[in-house]
Regions:
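Conserved residues at the C-terminal ends of beta-strands
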Residues: 1-3, 91, 190
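Aromatic-lined carbohydrate-binding surfaces of glycoside hydrolases
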Residues: 3-7, 52-53
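Aromatic-rich peripheral "rim/lid" segments of glycoside hydrolase catalytic domains that contact
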Residues: 5, 9-11, 19, 159-262
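Noncatalytic carbohydrate-binding groove/subsite architecture in carbohydrate-active enzymes
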Residues: 19-161
Length: 262
């Protein structure tokens, strides 16, 4: 319900502080939540925030809030005004979005392993799941609320240079991070094909590009197609280790297992 609600670019309500803005959104969310649960009790109902966790979004000229502040305000109002078993959707894009190599994002000074990290993405995804594991953030049953990665993408170009191999490596590595985190429920890519407008701005997120009005798969397309195939995933992602600069995946992901091989 709503898109990246910590940025009024998508959810305009005027000049409001985070408290006033969130209470209005929470009440609208409750209408949708109640309606959906009334006809399908097992549905997951969630709201999304972008990767700006403990800093204000840098784009858009309208009201902007820290994702962490929005989440806490929503959670507190939910506790006050009536229980909802809401879920959280996160859009963990690289920082900056014009580079696919999220594994180097700590060098920007915006991505770290603390709960006060300015940005949360795949480099430090555990920050959001650690936060949601806190007793104060759990649902009424004491369970960690479901977390969905409902929009992520990695550009295949950077500064006019081809970065399709880096993009493919980013898809493999990010999927492995999500699959090895027991608190992540879903992983959804943002683009099947490149958006013309986004590509002009250096954001070639598609798994395929368009050439002469036809889809041409990138390397990332093959990776995404086979990444959760237990018999193919290891070979499909083998190239990515050299791109990232590691010998084995457990150097980066403690207790690593390939998808389907638990």
């Amino acid at each position: 319900v709503g898109n990246e609600i910590n940025n009024q670019y998508w959810n305009y309500m005027g000049d409001l502080d985070v408290s006033a803005y969130t209470v209005k959104f929470q009440r609208a969310f409750r209408v949708f939540y109640t309606a959906m649960k009334s006809v399908s009790a097992n549905d997951n109902v969630m709201f999304s925030i972008d990767h700006y966790w403990n800093m204000l979004p840098e784009a858009a000229p309208v009201g902007k809030y820290k994702g962490k502040d929005i989440l806490l305000a929503f959670h507190n109002y939910e506790a006050t005004e009536g229980y909802m078993d809401y879920g959280l959707a996160l859009h963990p894009y690289p920082y900056p979005m014009t580079s696919p190599n999220f594994w180097d994002d700590d060098k920007t000074g915006k991505v770290n392993d603390t709960m006060d990290s300015p940005v949360v993405n795949f480099k430090n995804l555990h920050v959001i799941t650690d936060f949601m594991q806190m007793e104060s953030m759990r649902n009424r049953k004491g369970q960690v609320r479901k977390i969905f990665l409902t929009e992520e993408g990695f550009t295949s170009t950077q500064g006019g240079k081809d970065k399709s191999i880096d993009q493919a490596a980013a898809v493999a590595y990010s999927y492995f991070i999500a699959d090895n985190n027991p608190y992540i429920t879903a992983y959804l890519m943002s683009r099947q094909e490149d958006s013309v407008d986004e590509t002009k701005n250096g954001l070639a997120f598609g798994l395929s590009k368009i050439v002469n009005n036809k889809l041409v798969p990138k390397r990332a397309h093959e990776v995404f197609k086979y990444i959760d195939n237990a018999s193919a995933t290891e070979g499909t992602a083998d190239f990515a280790r050299a791109v990232i600069g590691i010998d084995s995946w457990d150097q980066l992901i403690p207790g690593f297992h390939f998808p389907g091989r638990e």
